[in-house]
Design a protein with these regions (language model features):
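A short alpha-helical cap/connector motif
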Residues: 1-141, 148-169, 173-222
């Protein structure tokens, strides 16, 4: 879709990104150490969310007054710590992941952040875990950052369990720009492209796609 608003954006140069980071909340020692330990893992560290995404997740949880949250795809725990810190005092976060090696790091940082009692981590296919949850609209916030081909199925399972006004966030919706490249026919790209096309037409939610990091879509249940 073309139009005069199409060019209403500011390109993020390295200097401007540094400025942006300097005017956002800085990660505390727990998150700084977690990010450093994750970076030391090598190329796999790219699976960690960006610092500004973590700040946004904490902000969202607080704005929503979230008590119950679900995360699909925990990795080393940066996003989980960010979400859990934004929950109300008696709030709880359910994390779903398959990898015990990466989540062992997450567990250490949950404890260090004083959040171990508020976060439940289940090592199992996320779709199986989600289907065990009551099919009642009790969840306030969801963050999906798992296998891309599973996003649509996760969404359909979680939406009935989300309260009206609750929010589902989808990470990597720009997929490095591949979603706008017709020649990219990889399974992940096709799945994300189809999800993006579907969500923008789904009248069950209000939607915004943000150019944050690798793209973050927020869907608010009507």
């Amino acid at each position: 879709m073309a139009g005069p608003m199409q060019e209403k954006f500011t390109a993020l140069t390295p200097a401007l990104y540094d400025y942006l980071m300097a005017h956002n909340p800085l990660p505390d020692p727990v998150l700084r150490d977690l990010a450093a330990e994750t970076a030391a893992l090598g190329p796999i560290s790219r699976m960690q969310i960006a610092v500004e995404q973590g700040a946004l997740l904490t902000f969202l949880a607080r704005v929503l007054g979230a008590r119950r949250a679900v995360e699909l795809g925990t990795f080393t725990g940066y996003s989980a710590v960010s979400i859990a810190r934004g929950l109300v005092p008696d709030g709880r976060l359910l994390c779903c992941d398959l990898n015990e090696e990466w989540t062992a790091i997450a567990r250490r940082y949950f404890a260090r952040a004083g959040l171990a009692e508020r976060i439940t981590l289940r090592i199992a296919p996320a779709i199986e875990t989600v289907r065990t949850l009551p099919r009642t609209p009790e969840i306030d916030l969801v963050f999906i950052d798992a296998d891309k081909t599973g996003y649509r199925a996760y969404y359909e399972e979680l939406l009935p369990r989300l309260r009206a006004g609750g929010v589902i966030g989808f990470d990597n919706v720009l997929w490095g720009g591949s979603v706008a490249d017709p020649s990219d026919t990889s399974d992940d790209t096709i799945a994300l492209r189809a999800l993006n096309d579907f969500l923008v037409r789904d009248d069950r939610v209000d939607l915004v796609m943000l150019p944050v990091a690798d793209g973050l879509t927020l869907a608010r249940k009507r």
